[in-house]
Amino acid sequence: MVGEIPVLLIMKKPIVVSGDVSVYDVAKLMVEQDVPCVLVVCERPNHESIEVATDKDIIKKVLIRKLPPDKVKVEDISSGKLVTIPPNTTIDEALEIMNKYKTNELFIVDDGKIVGVITEEDLIKIAPEIISTLKELVNYLLQIIDEVTSGDISDKSKEIQNINQGKDNKKDSESDIRKKKIMLIK
């Protein structure tokens, strides 16, 4: 199922900017690259940190306050609260983590390095595939219900029991028996 896919297969390479870049330039880059967030390398006294700036940060911390985006540095609005996950995290697990930490982006860390980002938007884009898979599952379950109510399954079940007990043909090999079972299921 789609939810079992590891985020490694759908993650994107994160965009990294210097903390002294203007919010205007970062917003322009985000629009050009069609991404809702960037990693920000901030040079702080005595240390360097990696933070995140999102489109929501720009709206809440700059635009709503009517600050000039070309004068505000991105490091002044970025946050050090990165939520990280390993590359083998499944999509279902990623959604749970996003909900738990109330975040729209997760950063994928491998061997201590940020190697990717997955956003809520990325997960929404694959939602049609999830819906399609769920529809297939529902149709399959409805088919089983129909077979059970029509008695077809019990007939197949008896045939499989006969095959297992060797009543069908004692000369059949294991491979032949498997093939017969598969044909019954189909």
Curated annotation (Swiss-Prot):
Record domain CBS: where: 10-69, 77-133
Keyword Repeat: yes
Coiled coil: none
Gene3D superfamilies: CBS-domain
Domain of life: Archaea
SMART domains membership: CBS
Keyword tags: CBS domain, Repeat
Family annotation (SUPFAM superfamilies): CBS-domain pair
Protein name per its UniProtKB record: Uncharacterized protein MJ0450
Organism: Methanocaldococcus jannaschii (strain ATCC 43067 / DSM 2661 / JAL-1 / JCM 10045 / NBRC 100440)
